[in-house]
């Protein structure tokens, strides 16, 4: 961007440099001397004010010029409106017309509305509101936000300033090429074709979710899973009566809420598994609430009906209490009794799923570029970044250029749920896609774009936007934030780095761990990613005083050596709950100990003896409990505590004793207290630490 020096502009305007500098300072454009430079916008503004002025007498010309430069920015803007609208005519007509324009603007401004983007500079806000930027800067500084005229502020702060000036504020919705791509155009009814339902199986841990899926798809993964609990989200296709059903398997424990939520966003039908012997459990209630919130139809599979302790009617009663009344009881909830182990009722369950799918009238357009959702992503040896994708509309084909979040790629290969290579995948089909530039995030929307070059450009732009948003948020500094950060010096932090084999595990661990935070200890996951533990992870942990948690991954050799050198703690796990329990234990070490008072006993002072060199000793009778030699005590007189301290000596007759039980007499010497009187009550107690 070219810049103009003050003396060059003065020469062009036929003014002296001194006069121009004076007038620029009046406009809050700070220049030091004739060699100072001006931005193009500033030059344009000044030229706009002085160019094409009607030729008049020197006196009138000078007066007009002075008036212009004495106006504030609002007047300048009004002058520009006036000049643009009324360039011709006599000076008298111009003045009259200007008044008319200003009156009209004033009437329109009674309800002033401005549109503000997510971020804008102080200068841009001033231009929108037609006020002096200096005034805005003053108001922001008063709120503790230090900014310059070209520094960006966020929508929230900009809106507050605008409201102070009487403006109604709307947020600008900027639609770039990315958002336009994400906005799916509605399909014509004639292009839509029936598609298979996508079914998610949910339920309480150990209620037989995986076993039910095994029975449905005739596979056996239960024994391969660590701890008998599904660790990763899988997808499979089942065919019945020449119709297909797609099953998603979301883990059923509370720790995997994030993974479950992701599964339900693309789900058409939910099968809720409830054990006939256990009934409704906490995770069952959680799953029901999630399904209700997602407004997805639900079928209840009452599993383990082959067990002697099975009680399906009790399950139905408990479900009814939660608003899921079975059809046979006059409600709308389909309940199917099944036994995954004995293969009972499986066909009936599948028929019910197809029936509900038919009622839902599930359709999609296969004859268009594909759109879908990443349900799982990982880095696989020999394959590189691999993602499981559910195609939701259109058809995904080999060679398609794809975009998912900030990751781009080209479909090099596709595998179906049986591991077979396929060339295309239609609506509802789950496929494993190879060809991504990096590991995408689970939950990202996948879209097909015209070519790989375009996909790369869009992915890079998304990355830039993310960095820009992060940078802008970092630039927001207020006195309030600064004060709270100083105050938080007393809050202890436990920093954690998570590395796992799949993205879903990273998310689940992150949420579970961060939920353990409390008022005294804040747990902060500073990094989470897929892949082995590297030297970079160890260096980050060393710099941040963090613990590294590896889930189903191992540290590289160099990383292990570096961790020993840097004294970085690496914990490796194969079951998620063990990781959470260990973190809880680590937290206890950071918590300030809490104590509670435990009363040991009460003794009444019945005589006071003066012992030379020792002081007063209380002759006492133990009313309740026991008095210990090392216990804390308080002396109570007429219901008022007169002293708190410790026992200096405890004797029975002339012997020192460790404790005196209820009903016995003893002599108690109190540390640094001689004002003991007959009738005083001595309460003995000790402080016990409360387990955290």
From Swiss-Prot:
Sorted UniProt keywords: Cytoplasm, GTP-binding, Initiation factor, Nucleotide-binding, Protein biosynthesis
- GO MF terms on file? GTP binding; GTPase activity; translation initiation factor activity
**Chief localisation class:** cytoplasm
Keyword Cytoplasm set for record:
yes
According to the record, the residues making up region (G5) are 339-341
Spans annotated as G1: 203-210
InterPro entries recorded? EF-G-like_DII (IPR053905), IF2_II (IPR044145), IF2_N (IPR006847), P-loop_NTPase (IPR027417), Small_GTP-bd (IPR005225), T_Tr_GTP-bd_dom (IPR000795), TF_IF2_bacterial-like (IPR000178), TIF_IF2 (IPR015760)
Pfam families named in the record: EF-G_D2 (PF22042), GTP_EFTU (PF00009), IF-2 (PF11987), IF2_N (PF04760)
Per UniProt, GTP binds at: 203-210, 249-253, 303-306
Any one Gene Ontology cellular component term annotated for this protein = cytosol
Give the source's domain of life in one word: Bacteria
Which SUPFAM superfamilies does the UniProt entry name for this protein? Answer: Initiation factor IF2/eIF5b, domain 3 (SSF52156), P-loop containing nucleoside triphosphate hydrolases (SSF52540), Translation proteins (SSF50447)
Name the record gives this protein:
Translation initiation factor IF-2
Q: Which organism is it from?
A: Thermoanaerobacter sp. (strain X514)
What lineage, starting at the top, does this entry show? Answer: Bacteria, Bacillati, Bacillota, Clostridia, Thermoanaerobacterales
């Amino acid at each position: 961007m070219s810049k103009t020096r003050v003396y060059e502009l003065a020469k062009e305007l036929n003014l002296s440099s001194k006069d121009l500098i004076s007038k620029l300072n009046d406009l809050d454009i700070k220049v030091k001397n004739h060699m100072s430079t001006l931005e193009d916008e500033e030059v344009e503004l000044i030229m706009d004010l002085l160019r094409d002025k009607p030729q008049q007498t020197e006196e009138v010309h000078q007066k007009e010029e002075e008036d212009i430069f004495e106006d504030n920015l609002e007047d300048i803007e009004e002058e520009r409106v006036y000049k643009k609208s009324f360039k011709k005519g006599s000076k008298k007509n111009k003045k009259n017309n200007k008044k008319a324009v200003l009156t009209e603007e004033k009437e329109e401004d009674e309800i002033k509305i401005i549109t503000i983007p997510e971020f804008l500079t102080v200068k841009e806000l001033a231009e929108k509101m037609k006020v002096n930027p200096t005034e805005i800067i003053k108001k922001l500084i008063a709120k503790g936000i230090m900014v310059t005229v070209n520094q960006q502020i966020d929508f929230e702060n900009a809106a507050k300033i605008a409201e102070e000036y009487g403006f109604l504020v709307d947020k600008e919705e900027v639609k770039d090429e990315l958002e336009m791509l994400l906005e799916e155009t509605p399909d014509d009814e004639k292009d839509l074709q029936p598609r298979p339902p996508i079914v998610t199986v949910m339920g309480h841990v150990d209620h037989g979710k995986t076993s039910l899926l095994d029975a449905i798809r005739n596979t056996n993964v239960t024994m391969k899973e660590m701890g008998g609990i599904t660790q990763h989200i899988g997808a499979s296709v089942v065919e019945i009566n020449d119709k297909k059903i797609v099953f998603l398997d979301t883990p059923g424990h509370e720790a995997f809420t994030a993974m479950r939520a992701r599964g339900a966003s693309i789900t058409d039908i939910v099968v809720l598994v409830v054990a006939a012997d256990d009934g409704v459990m906490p995770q069952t209630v959680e799953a029901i609430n999630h399904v209700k919130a997602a407004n997805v139809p639900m079928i209840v599979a009452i599993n383990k009906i082959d067990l002697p302790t099975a009680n399906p009617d009790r399950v139905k009663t408990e479900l009814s209490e939660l608003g899921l009344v079975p059809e046979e009881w006059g409600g709308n909830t389909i309940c199917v009794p099944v036994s995954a182990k004995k293969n009972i009722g499986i066909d009936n369950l599948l028929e019910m799923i197809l029936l509900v799918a038919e009622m839902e009238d599930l359709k999609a357009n296969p004859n268009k570029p594909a759109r879908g959702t990443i349900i799982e992503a990982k880095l696989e040896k020999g394959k590189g970044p691999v993602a499981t994708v559910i195609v939701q509309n259109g058809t995904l084909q080999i060679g398609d250029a794809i975009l998912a979040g900030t990751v781009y790629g080209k479909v090099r290969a596709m595998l179906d749920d049986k591991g077979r290579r396929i060339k295309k995948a239609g609506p509802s089909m789950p496929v494993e896609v190879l060809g991504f530039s990096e590991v995408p995030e689970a939950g990202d929307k996948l879209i097909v774009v015209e070519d790989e070059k375009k996909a790369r450009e869009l992915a890079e732009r998304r990355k830039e936007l993310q960095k820009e948003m992060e940078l802008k948020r970092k630039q927001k500094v207020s006195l309030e934030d600064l004060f709270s950060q100083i105050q938080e010096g007393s809050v202890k932090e436990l920093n954690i780095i998570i590395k796992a084999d799949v993205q879903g595990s990273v998310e689940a661990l992150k949420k579970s761990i961060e939920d353990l935070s409390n008022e005294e200890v804040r747990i902060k996951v500073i990094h989470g990613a897929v892949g082995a533990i590297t030297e970079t992870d160890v260096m980050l942990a060393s710099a941040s005083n963090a613990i590294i948690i590896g889930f189903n991954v191992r540290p590289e050799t160099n990383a292990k050596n570096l961790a020993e050198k840097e004294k970085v703690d690496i914990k490796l796990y194969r079951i998620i709950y063990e990781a959470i329990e260990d973190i809880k234990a680590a937290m206890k070490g950071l918590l300030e100990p809490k104590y509670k008072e435990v009363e040991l006993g009460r003794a009444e002072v019945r005589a006071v003896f003066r012992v030379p060199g020792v002081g007063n000793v209380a002759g006492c009778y133990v009313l309740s409990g026991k008095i210990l030699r090392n216990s804390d005590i308080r002396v109570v007189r007429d219901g008022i505590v007169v002293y708190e301290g410790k026992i200096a000596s405890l004797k029975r007759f002339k012997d020192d004793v460790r404790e005196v039980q209820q009903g016995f007499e003893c002599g108690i010497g109190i540390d640094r207290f001689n004002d003991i009187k007959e009738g005083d009550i001595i309460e003995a107690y000790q402080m016990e630490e409360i387990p955290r």
